A protein has these predicted regions:
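A short beta-turn/loop motif at secondary-structure boundaries
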Residues: 92-97
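Short amphipathic alpha-helical segments
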Residues: 49, 99-101
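Conserved short beta-strand edge segments in small beta-sheet-based binding/regulatory domains
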Residues: 120-145
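Helix N-cap motif at beta-to-alpha junctions
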Residues: 104-112
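Charge-rich, low-complexity segments
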Residues: 1-77, 84-90, 108-109, 142-144
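Generic non-transmembrane alpha-helical segments
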Residues: 78-85, 113-121
């Protein structure tokens, strides 16, 4: 959830949709934070942060095994805690042996430390973090809202 001090608005609703499809012939699961739609394109959160975690032992269909999936759920909780009020998690995309967490933020000063902290949060996996301007929320909007 995004905090009032960060957005200048009331806290956003914590509502998520589950979408299913395929990407390059493999199943794709997307959890989409529909409560964040009001922030899209408003200008306060124009930096997209992608956090990609490749699976160590994906199933043949590219999805995680149960044990690895559980570890990634714990990682997601840690990720949300580390972001705090600096941004909001808008999507979690699972496909092709990777889980990607998509966030939007208005500031990037904290991202380098965030990347180091994430690597410590799941030392059994490689964590890749990227940040790019995305004032139109292209990734988020590609899933429909």
């Amino acid at each position: 959830m995004v905090h009032e001090q960060f957005t200048g608005t009331s806290p956003l609703p914590d509502t998520w949709d589950l979408l299913q499809g395929d990407h390059l012939g493999q199943p794709m699961l997307v959890r989409l934070n529909t409560g964040a739609a009001d922030l899209a394109g408003r200008g306060s959160h124009d930096i997209r942060v992608g956090v990609a975690v490749p699976f160590n032992a994906p199933r043949p269909d590219g999805l995680p095994e149960l044990v690895e999936g559980d570890a990634l759920e714990d990682f997601e909780d840690e990720l949300v805690d580390l972001v705090g009020g600096r941004g909001t998690l808008v999507a979690v995309i699972t496909t092709g042996g990777v889980r990607e967490f998509v966030l939007y933020t208005g500031e990037e000063w904290w991202i380098h430390q965030f990347q180091r902290d994430l690597a410590s949060a799941i030392p059994s996996h490689r964590v890749q973090v990227s940040a790019k301007p995305d004032p139109d929320w292209c990734v988020y909007r590609s899933f429909g809202p």
